[in-house]
Swiss-Prot record:
GO biological process terms, semicolon-separated: tRNA pseudouridine synthesis
Pfam families: PseudoU_synth_1 (PF01416)
Lineage, highest ranks first: Archaea, Methanobacteriati, Methanobacteriota, Methanomada group, Methanopyri
Protein name (Swiss-Prot/TrEMBL): tRNA pseudouridine synthase A
Substrates-to-products reaction catalysed: uridine(38/39/40) in tRNA = pseudouridine(38/39/40) in tRNA
RNA-binding in keyword set: no
InterPro entries recorded: PsdUridine_synth_cat_dom_sf, PsdUridine_synth_TruA, PsdUridine_synth_TruA_a/b_dom, PsdUridine_synth_TruA_C
GO MF annotations, alphabetized: RNA binding; tRNA pseudouridine(38-40) synthase activity
Keywords annotated in UniProt: Isomerase, tRNA processing
Gene designation per UniProt: truA
Family: Belongs to the tRNA pseudouridine synthase TruA family.
Length: 256
């Protein structure tokens, strides 16, 4: 049996999840910690962008299951990366392909027109061509967004929830950019129809908001249940990600 680990991290100091030589990455830190215990990382659920965060990343490791425990791994990790739960999985389990759906959240801060922004978000639900909401990567742009909703978390501070079976490169950040633009009167909510038609002017694509406001919030699997551990409670602050994200506009949103 392999072991799946649920990992939370504050990505502020890292150049994304995927390993890169000579720069700090989440995968690099995990591989180093795991190797000291004779464990090997063999798969992960999502390749988050530089600066993005996660409260529900899933990685799969091979090696002695008795050593694949949160406490010894966390003792070898930086404090802004925590293994908070584990479970045993079958040998064929693929944390990316076996995911039923993922939820991302983007912290938008205050909005001048929250009602219009909320309606704009809802227009993106359903099966659409999301070519206008991605950086080109050759993948099929037809995606069914199961939920896209604006939630007020404190007075005039908003978070965008987006749930789908899969996502395109920069998709959530551009969806957030569209909702943010509507929320500040820079675009009309009715623009959604043209953007989702697949026939749009490239210059009209929504802005891509900075990754620092983005959190991989949840991943749903069939029959995979994680055991919460002591690390869940002691290091829960890592996945709260800070009031610094909630009440201000993400850096660079005005100019990107």
């Amino acid at each position: 049996m392999r072991v799946a680990l649920r990992v939370a991290y504050d990505g502020s100091r890292y150049h994304g999840f995927q390993y890169q030589p000579d720069v700090p990455t989440i995968e690099g830190a995990l591989r180093k910690a795991l190797s000291e215990l004779g464990l090997e990382l063999v798969g992960y659920a999502s390749r988050t962008d530089a600066g993005a965060h996660a409260r529900y990343q899933v990685v799969v490791v091979e090696g002695d299951p008795e050593l694949a425990q949160p406490d010894p791994i966390n003792a070898r990790l930086p404090k802004d990366i925590r293994v908070i739960a584990k479970t045993e999985v079958h040998e064929e389990f693929d944390p990316r392909r076996d995911a039923l759906r993922k939820e991302y959240r983007y912290f938008l801060g205050p909005l001048n027109r929250p009602e219009a922004a909320a309606r704009a978000a809802r227009k993106l639900e359903g099966k659409h061509d999301f070519s206008a909401f991605r950086r080109e990567d050759g993948r099929n742009p037809i995606i069914t967004v199961e939920r896209c909703e604006l939630v007020e978390i404190t007075p005039n501070a908003y978070v965008l929830r987006v749930v789908a079976p899969r996502f395109l490169w920069e998709m959530v950040r551009r969806i957030a950019g569209f909702v943010w633009e509507v929320g500040h009167g820079l675009r009309e909510e009715g623009d959604a129809e043209a953007l989702l038609s697949g026939k749009f002017e490239p210059s009209k694509k929504p802005r891509c908001l900075p990754a620092e406001g983005l959190i991989l919030w949840h991943i749903e699997y069939d029959e995979v249940r994680f055991e919460r551990t002591k690390a869940w409670f002691e290091d829960h602050k890592v996945i709260q990600l800070g009031g610094r994200l909630l009440l201000r506009l993400p850096e660079g949103a005005e100019s990107c």
